[in-house]
A protein has these predicted regions:
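Conserved, mostly hydrophobic/aromatic
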Residues: 54, 76, 110, 123, ...
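Metal- or metallocofactor-binding catalytic centers and their adjacent structured scaffolds
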Residues: 10, 50-122
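Hydrophobic faces of well-ordered beta-strands that scaffold small-molecule active sites
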Residues: 59, 139-142, 172-176, 204-208, ...
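Glycine-rich, aromatic-flanked loop segments that form ligand/cofactor-binding clefts
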Residues: 105, 111-151
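Structured beta-strand/loop patches that form or line metal/cofactor-binding pockets in enzymes
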Residues: 1-58, 62, 346-350
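Extended hydrophobic packing segments that form well-structured cores
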Residues: 369-388
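Shared catalytic-loop signature of beta/alpha-barrel
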Residues: 27, 78, 223, 229, ...
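Metal-dependent enolase-superfamily TIM-barrel catalytic cores that perform enediolate-based chemistry
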Residues: 136-254
Length: 388
């Protein structure tokens, strides 16, 4: 039997031109702002699993690459030693139990690396292992959050202008991430301004990222989404996406479909949410939802109910699961803005990219078809960035 002989985790740092943090300096996905001439420090982590016969599986984290998830992965990694790497379901069940008292955010990258290993050992792509059938993925532009500082996405008009530019560039749709102060009037004004700028018929989405302060604010902004014929409305208010009853009552009052459960972890919890009437579309993420194994469980559950699924964020694992999922619409290029590059780690030695300038002329990104996840990590660059 082949077994896992070693698991290596590495924490690395890099800098991104043109981005920065607001005056308070707190690090977080929603706190990134446009700062001309600035270089924003960023941190991610990577994992490498090696078997006794020398085969390797790798993964570089994107949006899940936080210090807390790194700590969880450090807790979990020793449990892989000596395991048969092909028994992914058994490993998945064991790791899920091991971090049952936590948020599971360190689990996904380990599972993804096991899938990468499985593909490389068989010289086939993860997409093929999953039965994937898509080679091109329609991609929407997912904006950075609105900022109070001058520059970037600082007004409803700035959002409208950027959305129009994204439509002209060929994106399949556009998602607004609004401001952090919960100003429902400004959020609704942005919704209407963006629709006016891009015209009818092009898919628009809104994700307030749980910043609207009350259910009534969420209803008010949702009514603007109805007026503007939005494709979906996502995680609107300060329940942080967890209140089934609140979302059920929003659904009763709004026409715009609710996309829910980005911050509800795992199959059972998401199933309970949607069966309780809390949403129309379900969010899943192979990084957040305990790997490719966990994400595909959620996709299959949604398909059994005849519901659609959306994958959150971007990355090679996200492309693989989307390629194998019939009941989904768009790939999310998150996050981007005017002269604001995506903050995904620049560690690929191949053509893989989640930057807007590399969107295909057909408004799609390609699904990697090489062995494993189909991407080549620049090990020399990764070693240069590594700090732990």
């Amino acid at each position: 039997m082949t077994f896992v002989a070693s698991v290596e985790l590495s924490l690395f740092r890099f800098e991104i031109d043109g981005l920065g943090l607001p005056p308070h300096g707190a690090v977080g996905v929603g706190n990134i702002v446009a700062k001309k001439g600035s270089r924003m420090p960023a941190q991610r982590w990577a994992i490498r699993i090696e078997t006794d016969d020398g085969a390797r599986g790798e993964y570089v984290t994107h949006w899940v690459g936080t210090p807390s998830s790194f700590a969880q992965a450090t807790m979990l990694a020793p449990h892989l030693l000596g395991c048969d790497p092909d028994r992914r379901e058994e490993i998945w069940q064991d790791l899920r139990r091991e971090v049952r008292a936590y948020d599971h955010m360190g689990h996904g990258p380990l599972d993804i690396a096991l899938w990468d290993l499985a593909g490389k050992r068989r010289n086939v792509s993860v997409t093929r292992l999953l039965g994937g059938f898509k080679t091109r993925l329609p991609t929407y532009a997912s904006s950075y959050h609105g900022q109070e500082e001058s520059g970037g996405l600082d007004t409803p008009r700035a959002f409208a202008d950027y959305a129009a530019a994204c439509r002209a560039r060929g994106f399949a749709g556009f998602k607004i991430h609004g401001w952090h102060n919960g100003d429902a009037a400004r959020e609704a004004a942005t919704v209407l301004a963006v629709r006016k700028a891009v015209g009818d018929g092009w898919p628009l989405m809104l994700d307030p990222a749980s910043q609207l302060r009350t259910w009534r604010d969420a209803l008010y902004v949702g009514e603007a989404c109805d007026e503007a014929c939005f494709f979906w409305y996502e995680d609107p208010y300060r329940d942080t996406g967890g209140a089934v009853e609140g979302h059920k009552r929003l659904r009763e009052r709004l026409r715009t479909p609710l996309l829910v459960c980005e911050h509800v972890r795992g199959l059972e919890a998401k199933a309970a949410f949607v069966l309780g009437g809390g949403g129309d579309l379900i969010h899943a993420d192979p990084e957040y939802d305990m790997g490719i194994t966990g994400a595909m469980k959620i996709a299959n559950f949604c398909q059994a109910l005849g519901l659609d699924l959306q994958y959150h964020a971007c990355g090679p694992a996200h492309r693989a699961v989307m390629a194998a999922t019939p009941n989904t619409h768009f790939y999310e290029m998150a996050l981007i803005g005017p002269d604001m590059p995506n903050s995904v780690p620049p560690v690929y030695a191949c053509a893989y990219s989640d930057q807007p300038q590399d969107l295909g002329s057909d408004g799609c990104v390609s699904v990697p078809d090489g062995p494993g996840l189909g991407v080549e990590v620049d090990l020399e660059k990764l070693a240069k960035f590594t700090v732990k």
